[in-house]
Amino acid sequence: MSSVEVSLLGSLANIGALLATPLCTYLLNSLGRKYTCMLFGLPYVFCWIIITYTKSVTVVIAAMGLAGMGAAGQAASSVYISEIAQDAIRGALTSSVVSGLFLGLLLSYSWGGYLSYEQVVYVHLTLSILYILLVGLLKESPVFLMKSGKEKEAARSLAFYRRVSVTSKEVEVALAKIKLQLDPALETRLEGGKDPGVTDALVEGKAEEKRAVSEWQFLKNSQSSKRGLKVAIIVMAYTVLMGVIVMQVYAEPLFKEAVPSMESNQCSIILAIVFIIASLLCGVLVDKLGRKYLMIGTTFAAGVCILLLGTQLQFHWAPNYVSAIFIYGFCFFYNLGPAPIPFVIAAEFFLPEVRGLCSNLVNACAWIMNFITLTIFSIMVEVFGLAPLFYIFAASSAFGVVYCLFYLPETKGLSVDAIQLLFIKERRRDAK
């Protein structure tokens, strides 16, 4: 493959994901969370079927673009999980999306070293089909069911995920909280300083009647949603600009220089193991330490690692194996916080009326930034080398630490109405 074809193979998936994002937004609110997740598994099935029957580089690249359309469904997965999870464990469960991604990477790297090309393709095709079948066994999100006026089905969904009786008090309280989230007067009440707790009227189902408003119109009128979207997009943008994509692309030549005695496939497997350990640890810590300070600490640590790696590449002040330590250190801290937390906050910041839209806008930002990073920065590497590029990534990390310190709210264990109140209070402080 030529250098252009290799570049397209890596970046075209981001374009496919970006193009499919509007469709994901529409389907989340029309088809539902569960069936959207199933539908976005189909591009992977078609991708592997195409690759099974062709050896053409052009067709394989096109198939990867098709698989990228399936990647747009990551927003649907995050929204789905956040809506079926209880507030106390929402962060851990939502971050499991990233843990699953890295587990898949580890398995793919492992199979790549021991299976033939055809066997790898068939395994991935089988898993893609299995994913669709297994998701089909789950219940729809209770929030979406309530939005659709299916209260009895929502109660059954809650009972299924909480493992309790449909008539239990826990289900009754959970339904009341969902009604509160869907109350069109919620933000007005919060703006007026009223207690966002569940009122007797809401428990009795006497919330104001919903008016038909488009997602874009709701977002335009919702100050808390606009502020949450701004914060989520900035956090997502700076985490991509921390350079993990470039690190993954150039990991092999860096490892060859740092540890020439180790095969590149072994280095990739170890890297995937580091990814998984960090993301699983994030699942434990994100609901204990909280999003804000875990994000600040890990961003700072990852920035230090990437800065030291840049100086090592430029000045060679330590043995070559130190580069490998910095690479693993950066990847560990990045996947402990900056990798999963943006997807967690994108799934929990927003009211149900705009959750699908805003989550997809945040994900679209990620696809755009990934594409820019892979295309523009690859040119910059040829002109300036890797070391100055890593200084840019370190600067992005420094920006992220400062931004999260002042603007990222702590949402650990908070309900969606309490999160809206945080953004409203922040806006009031800015207005003073």
Give the ranges of each region predicted by the language model.
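Alpha-helical transmembrane bundle of multi-pass membrane proteins
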Residues: M1-Y161, E187-K432
